[in-house]
């Protein structure tokens, strides 16, 4: 497990990170979200040793992260980092050989990974000849070719179409299933919500929320409920602690001041006739994000 504990970083008088603490668990995908300038890239660069922290600790399996550990890390920066005049597979093979693989093994790994990422027909093209989306896939291959123990990706889904997002997501899930700790940032909250096991939300250099996706949803549970019934529902608004809301796609939606008030609606609805659906509305990641950064 990768663990950050009370990590701080300042640039002059500006505090970029303020006692940042969170964990990236082995075998899990951790989504790292925040607005522009929130501190995501600074945090990642400190983990990778590109930037020095002012204080705090970064540990892997309980020990301080050393240079030897970082050789087992995979990193994809937000900026384009590949050599434009190299062929795609040649580039990935070169990087694999830097990690100690033989030319034969590096070629096998690069070929399999590029094919898995949908670049099988473009692996002999120059990097500069690829579309931005395909360059993004090639950068992901560069981060993955040595099968890293820790994988850190800064905006890996930027510029990808929905099909490419699905392909890349599948590759990341495979890496996590193999035991890697995977941390990725993204502004695409719907993609993060769909893919991640755990979430970290940062704003203004401070962690506003962290934990498993399901735990955060439960912690920030909505007071809104939806009810579908074959009978009239005008009576719902007359019950104590209930406010009828709009926006239900089927039936009626309402806000309940307490769970007991919501259960009173259900009991009354069942007394009046069959109920086909009664559910508490789950907050989206966008809902949670807006709530915690206020």
Language-model segments: residues:
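C-terminal coupling/interaction segments
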Residues: 257-294
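Structural motif
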Residues: 80, 240-243, 273
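ABC transporter nucleotide-binding domain
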Residues: 169-256
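Conserved catalytic Walker-motif region of ABC-type ATPase nucleotide-binding domains
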Residues: 4-7
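Short, flexible helix/strand-to-coil boundary loops that buttress conserved ligand/catalytic motifs
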Residues: 69, 220, 293
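ABC transporter nucleotide-binding domains
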Residues: 9-203, 209
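Short alpha-helical
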Residues: 64, 83, 190, 234, ...
């Amino acid at each position: 497990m990768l663990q950050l504990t009370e990590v701080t970083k300042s640039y002059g008088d500006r505090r970029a990170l303020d006692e940042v603490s969170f964990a990236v668990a082995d075998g899990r995908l951790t989504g790292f979200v925040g607005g522009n300038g929130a501190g995501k890239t600074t945090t990642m660069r400190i983990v990778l040793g590109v930037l020095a922290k002012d204080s705090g600790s970064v540990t892997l399996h309980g020990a301080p992260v050393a240079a030897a550990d970082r050789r087992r890390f995979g990193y994809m920066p937000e900026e384009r980092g590949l050599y434009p005049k190299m062929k795609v597979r040649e580039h990935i093979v070169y990087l694999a050989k830097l990690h100690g693989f033989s030319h034969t093994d590096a070629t096998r790994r690069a070929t399999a990974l590029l094919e898995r990422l949908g670049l099988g027909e473009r692996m002999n093209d120059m990097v500069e000849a690829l579309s931005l989306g395909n360059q993004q896939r090639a950068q992901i291959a560069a981060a993955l070719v040595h099968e890293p123990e820790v994988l850190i990706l800064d905006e890996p889904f930027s510029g990808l179409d929905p099909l490419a997002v699905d392909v890349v997501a599948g590759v990341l899930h495979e890496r996590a299933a193999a035991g890697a700790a995977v941390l990725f940032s993204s502004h695409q909250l719907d993609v993060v919500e769909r893919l991640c096991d755990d979430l970290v939300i940062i704003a203004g250099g401070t962690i506003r929320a962290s934990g498993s996706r399901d735990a955060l949803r439960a912690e920030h549970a909505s007071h809104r409920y939806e009810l579908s019934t074959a009978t009239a529902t005008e009576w719902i608004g007359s019950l104590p602690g209930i406010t009828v809301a709009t926006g239900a796609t089927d039936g009626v939606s309402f806000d309940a001041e307490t769970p007991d008030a919501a259960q009173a609606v259900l009991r009354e609805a069942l007394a009046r006739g069959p109920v086909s659906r009664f559910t508490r509305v789950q907050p989206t990641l966008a809902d949670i994000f807006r709530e915690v950064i206020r």
